[in-house]
Amino acid sequence: MQPLVIAAIVALVVAGIIAIVVWSIVFIEYRKIRRQRKIDKLIDRISERAEDSGNESEGDQEELSALVGMGHDAPWVINDL
């Protein structure tokens, strides 16, 4: 094979690997954002119910503690939202 063809194949492989890494990072961040939105909605719902009824909803608090108590999405991710 010619050197130009080999260089083109290597460039495609490298571009593919970079694309996989970038989209993996995007997917992990998307999951973090989606999880944070769930937590924010639960906190809002708990505070609204506390204002309305004078006490907090036990079911919402349990769901919130389950979401917050989850482990890391990936073991190599240290900072957690």
Curated annotation (Swiss-Prot):
Keyword Transport in annotation: yes
Localization annotation: Host membrane
Gene3D superfamilies: HIV-1 VPU cytoplasmic domain
Post-translational modifications reported in the UniProt record: Phosphorylated by host CK2. This phosphorylation is necessary for interaction with human BTRC and degradation of CD4.
Pfam families found in the cross-reference section: Vpu
One GO process term, biological-process aspect: viral release from host cell
Keyword Ligase: no
Origin: domain of life: Viruses
Segments on the Extracellular face: 1-7
SUPFAM superfamilies, per the entry: HIV-1 VPU cytoplasmic domain
Major place of residence: host cell
Membrane-crossing segments per the record: 8-28
A GO term, aspect molecular function: CD4 receptor binding
GO cellular component terms, semicolon-separated: host cell membrane; membrane
Similarity remark: Belongs to the HIV-1 VPU protein family.
Other information: HIV-1 lineages are divided in three main groups, M (for Major), O (for Outlier), and N (for New, or Non-M, Non-O). The vast majority of strains found worldwide belong to the group M. Group O seems to be endemic to and largely confined to Cameroon and neighboring countries in West Central Africa, where these viruses represent a small minority of HIV-1 strains. The group N is represented by a limited number of isolates from Cameroonian persons. The group M is further subdivided in 9 clades or subtypes (A to D, F to H, J and K).
Domain notes: The N-terminus and transmembrane domains are required for self-oligomerization and proper virion budding, whereas the cytoplasmic domain is required for CD4 degradation. The cytoplasmic domain is composed of 2 amphipathic alpha helix that form a U-shape.
Protein name, per record: Protein Vpu
Lineage of source species: Viruses, Riboviria, Pararnavirae, Artverviricota, Revtraviricetes
